């Protein structure tokens, strides 16, 4: 196994299961003997809860506010160690409606770099808020991560988010050297989901890294604030995350510059698979009474 540091980031539509998928994959990497650092880049501070068995880890910003400033903190103040010695940090953010949460990401990453947090790690993983690819939330794309993995499903908005994130990766690909590692499909049991995910990956100039089947054992584990690998290590679902980890581990050097598509092209893809019907423009702007009068 390579000792070279790999910096990866997980993006995806809010609610797609990005944080939990990344934690289970990282738990599997730790089982393989890899030394892991997780940097949570979401104000909800839920990027490490399954690794630490906690509701939410104290964040860099909240601890800095208590101490006076981030300069008053030590690395051990913000870093916790969880399952399989995975090191965990949450950047945090301000109260809703106050300030810029993206600045918390910038502050945290700068603090971690200056205090040697990355020393000895094989992987640093950034778990980033929803599909936001601007401001501080884009820092893992602009300056840190070499590989971006997008968690998606066969639902239209998840695919839209994947395409949007690909545009962000493309923007910084030449200046920052970041690449798209691939798509990870979290099954939602929609029609032709696997085929659709593979087709979207092809359109984006990347590949479907893994199709994660839906299994209720995941919910049972999460209710106990555990990854499936810790809760039910012999289960079929635990093996799915080990397979995902093996594929990402073997993907070093293979990520590519993405080729995002237009909204029209995305809708055409959905229509090709029978997921979406061609829009009837004749009904746009018509009231119920007007449609009834026209026999529509």
UniProtKB/Swiss-Prot annotation:
<keyword id="KW-0535">Nitrogen fixation</keyword>
<feature type="binding site">
    <location>
        <position position="100"/>
    </location>
    <ligand>
        <name>[4Fe-4S] cluster</name>
    </ligand>
</feature>
<comment type="similarity">
    <text>Belongs to the NifH/BchL/ChlL family.</text>
</comment>
<keyword id="KW-0547">Nucleotide-binding</keyword>
<feature type="binding site">
    <location>
        <begin position="12"/>
        <end position="19"/>
    </location>
    <ligand>
        <name>ATP</name>
    </ligand>
</feature>
<dbReference type="GO" id="GO:0051539">
    <property type="term" value="F:4 iron, 4 sulfur cluster binding"/>
</dbReference>
<dbReference type="InterPro" id="IPR030655">
    <property type="entry name" value="NifH/chlL_CS"/>
</dbReference>
<dbReference type="GO" id="GO:0005524">
    <property type="term" value="F:ATP binding"/>
</dbReference>
<protein>
    <recommendedName>
        <fullName>Nitrogenase iron protein</fullName>
        <ecNumber>1.18.6.1</ecNumber>
    </recommendedName>
</protein>
<dbReference type="InterPro" id="IPR000392">
    <property type="entry name" value="NifH/frxC"/>
</dbReference>
<keyword id="KW-0479">Metal-binding</keyword>
<keyword id="KW-0408">Iron</keyword>
<dbReference type="GO" id="GO:0046872">
    <property type="term" value="F:metal ion binding"/>
</dbReference>
<comment type="subunit">
    <text>Homodimer.</text>
</comment>
<keyword id="KW-0004">4Fe-4S</keyword>
<keyword id="KW-0560">Oxidoreductase</keyword>
<keyword id="KW-0411">Iron-sulfur</keyword>
<dbReference type="Pfam" id="PF00142">
    <property type="entry name" value="Fer4_NifH"/>
</dbReference>
<comment type="function">
    <text>The key enzymatic reactions in nitrogen fixation are catalyzed by the nitrogenase complex, which has 2 components: the iron protein and the molybdenum-iron protein.</text>
</comment>
<dbReference type="InterPro" id="IPR027417">
    <property type="entry name" value="P-loop_NTPase"/>
</dbReference>
<feature type="modified residue" description="ADP-ribosylarginine; by dinitrogenase reductase ADP-ribosyltransferase">
    <location>
        <position position="103"/>
    </location>
</feature>
<keyword id="KW-0013">ADP-ribosylation</keyword>
<dbReference type="GO" id="GO:0016163">
    <property type="term" value="F:nitrogenase activity"/>
</dbReference>
<dbReference type="InterPro" id="IPR005977">
    <property type="entry name" value="Nitrogenase_Fe_NifH"/>
</dbReference>
<dbReference type="GO" id="GO:0009399">
    <property type="term" value="P:nitrogen fixation"/>
</dbReference>
<feature type="binding site">
    <location>
        <position position="134"/>
    </location>
    <ligand>
        <name>[4Fe-4S] cluster</name>
    </ligand>
</feature>
<keyword id="KW-0067">ATP-binding</keyword>
């Amino acid at each position: 196994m390579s000792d070279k540091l790999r910096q990866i980031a997980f993006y995806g539509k809010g609610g797609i299961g990005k944080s939990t998928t990344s934690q289970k994959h990282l738990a599997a990497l730790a089982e393989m003997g890899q030394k892991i650092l997780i940097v949570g880049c979401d104000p909800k501070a839920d990027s490490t809860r399954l690794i630490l068995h906690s509701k939410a880890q104290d964040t860099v910003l909240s601890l800095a506010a208590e101490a006076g400033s981030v300069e008053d903190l030590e690395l051990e103040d913000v870093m916790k160690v969880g399952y399989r010695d995975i090191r965990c940090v949450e950047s945090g953010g301000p109260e809703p409606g106050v300030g810029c949460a993206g600045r918390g990401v910038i502050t945290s990453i700068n603090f971690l770099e200056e205090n040697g947090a990355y020393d000895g790690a094989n992987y640093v993983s950034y778990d980033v808020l929803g599909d936001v690819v601007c401001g501080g939330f884009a820092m893992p794309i602009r300056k840190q991560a070499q590989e971006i993995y997008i968690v998606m499903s066969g639902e239209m908005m998840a695919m839209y988010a994947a395409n949007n994130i690909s545009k962000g990766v493309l923007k910084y690909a030449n200046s920052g050297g970041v690449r798209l590692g691939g798509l990870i499909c979290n099954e939602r049991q929609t029609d032709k989901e696997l085929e659709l995910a593979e087709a979207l990956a092809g359109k984006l100039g990347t590949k479907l890294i893994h199709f994660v089947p839906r299994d209720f054992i995941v919910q049972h584990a999460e209710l106990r604030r555990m990854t499936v690998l810790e809760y039910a290590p012999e289960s079929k679902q635990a093996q799915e995350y080990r397979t995902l980890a093996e594929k990402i581990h073997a993907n070093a050097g293979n990520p590519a510059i993405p080729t995002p598509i237009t909204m029209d092209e995305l809708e055409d893809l959905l229509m090709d698979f029978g997921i979406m019907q061609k829009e009837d423009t004749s009904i746009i702007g018509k009231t119920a009474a007007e449609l009834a009068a026209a026999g529509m």
